[in-house]
């Protein structure tokens, strides 16, 4: 019970004896009783004496001593069987009183050896290590104590008049109780070490406490009589109180777990009290244990006193600590009422230790290996064994012969009755024999029968699975499920089509802007990012198409059985009506219009049958029924006789007879014949049954042939066969409906799950597509605004410079600087190139020394997507002196003029949603763009990327995104998509393209030119683009050379948007075995 100590166990004392010469007595018996030369058994008799000496003198109380005692007991058993008249004095000292008692009986020697075996087993159990973590020691101690109890119980049951005190009935009974109590204690230790439930532990502790408590009075009495040592009684008292405390403690834990906090507190109080009582008894035990430990034959382990003190003190501390905690919890939290101790229910007992019978002990393989062969097996002559084997073969021949006769007769009877169709074929004639008319017999065919009604009950409860599929009962549930499947399938198809359409629109809008801005358009082609999304959408669509084929198969199967399934769930009345309709040959499943009183319309000739014909049918039926009853009775009796014969043959043993007659010559045959006569009555009864069976079968065959030849029987039989065939067809149809319905329900249930999973996947994919499109649209809107601003600023600067040259440099405003761009496209992919969204900034100030002719500044840049106002809503302020404003020409022509003349698109009025990067990801319709012009003849980009161009700067590592803008932190773009329904990440995410691996092949642009590998011509005159076929490499002209002033930046690794297809989710794979 404690971590550092194990509970001490009592050791039973050993009986001692003196040397006995068994060899001489056995030799004398061999010579006198068996008529053999005893010198041939000198070695065996020497081994016999040596075995006794080893068992009772030389061995210690360990496993070796136990095995030697087992071996010697087995020899005693064999001696008693062969030499029951053996008489040798066996002196033994009483284990407790040390008084010597001698008896000339093998039974006394056997009882003494059994007692010593029990004592040795108790010593083995006490010496086993039972510390925590040593499960094998616990098992060995538990088994040894149960075996000791079994040995002692055998003494009480078989040796009624014990000559010594140690083997008296009361003392042995007390010793059995002690060993079983200790076995229960060891099992409790194992249960506590394995951390079983508190309720189970309390039951085992209750049994252990009860066992020790019941031994208190007996141990005191034996101490008073001077049989037991005083330490035994004190140890039993201490353990009785200790395990009572353990029982109450674990029951308190169980009550606390069950919410009975008041009962828990009371039980903890009782447990603490019992533990303290055990502690108070330790003083007397410690004083008496010293004598038991230091004796010549100690009955307690050397550390018994210290170990028990530690265990009891630990229990006291455990109870006190838990009680204080329980009091505090109840006072502060539970406020539960404390019941009285007497009102607490008693703890149930669980018996965990029973004695192991001695027969089971010696039957164990390990014991059989120890005891070895019989020393005197040669005393039974081999010829006797051979004769016994011959006799056994004769018995086996009789058993085989009678079994064959029985099986042959039973098979012959069954074959004859099957050939005649009996007794089922008599049913068609019984109604006629009862005088109800030739058609009344057919009414029984309208009964659906137990099998069909069982099918009906199953279907009414929701099929063979009793509604476990959740589809409901009958056809309504399946119809509703099929409708749900179609609805979900339609929604999923719409989602897939919508997602593909959104990707197509996004790609089209991107390419429009690419055509519009040419080499300045730096947004990646959509194909770089949408390949995996398109593949996933395609795979899901193909999976849905495959599932639709299975849906069609299930629908067809369901259509063919729906009406029959509905009939099965309609109840008995509908089934009877259907069977009646089938018998009358009516169309319609439920037999509408059928006459309720008659199943078949027959002519007057068929209805009329003379009373004499009916009487003849009745007589033949009675004759056949009586013969069939007799046949069944004969079959049953014959089987019983055969079983009794086999049992007698199995238990018959004439070994003793053969041994007694082993000296007689040529008497084997007569002995065998006389012994085999005991089986003759059984053989005769089987033969008579065979004869009676043959006669009855002939009688049945004759009577049945006469029955079917009667005129009335012929007419009734013909009608019956016709209608029975119709009934069987209906039954087969209902069986098919029942079996197919199980397949349909299973397929529909799996189909619902499949489409539900598919819908979730498609929904997640569509959400990701929408997010991607919104991000791309937001990025495209920013790029368009910036490029338009560059164009307008460039055009305005040219006009202003022209105006300034007309003024002669005397005054006027300087050319406006190029609007500062706050992002190098790293921000468009998740970087933080600027602290906020792209802003045009304040208008530039007038250059020094230039005359100000107007109060108006340069025009503001175009609005960003998240700004509501257009240029018409925020026009530039009116100029004070427009004739002298050098910037006025910027708004009279060029792209700014066109931008101001166009009203803002209504699609741009909704403010976009902002995600993790600096972009405003608008999820509305694509931005208005000019129509895609017809493809030119050649497309060869020739611009040289500058330091500030997006091509040069977008793939560098951007600065980190400000903390306030990281709403999708940790996202990784489209390379690693989130799981369905777990949204996150933006177009660029917080991990920009700078960390990409560029070892993969360069991606292709939608027009066939690899991104990052365009070839540039030598002049601006050759900058007209030329369309190539999709996937075709661009044409290389001799006059063109690869741009070499600055190496092209490596292309970004294509990030894959890996939305798993439904097939990767373990979903539908096609096939119809079973559906879905």
UniProtKB/Swiss-Prot annotation:
It comes from the Eukaryota. It is found in: Cytoplasm; Endosome. Residues 775-1076 are annotated as: Disordered. Its main location: cytoplasm. Keywords: Coiled coil, Cytoplasm, Endosome, Protein transport, Transport. Residues 795-804, 1021-1036 have a biased composition (Low complexity). Residues 837-846 have a biased composition (Pro residues). GO terms for biological process: protein transport to vacuole involved in ubiquitin-dependent protein catabolic process via the multivesicular body sorting pathway. Residues 489-550 form a coiled coil. GO terms for cellular component: endosome. Residues 889-910 have a biased composition (Polar residues). Residues 775-794 have a biased composition (Basic and acidic residues). Residues 8-413 form the BRO1 domain. Belongs to the BRO1 family. PANTHER family: PCD6 INTERACTING PROTEIN-RELATED, TYROSINE-PROTEIN PHOSPHATASE NON-RECEPTOR TYPE 23. Involved in concentration and sorting of cargo proteins of the multivesicular body (MVB) for incorporation into intralumenal vesicles. This is Vacuolar protein-sorting protein BRO1. It comes from Mycosarcoma maydis. The gene is BRO1.
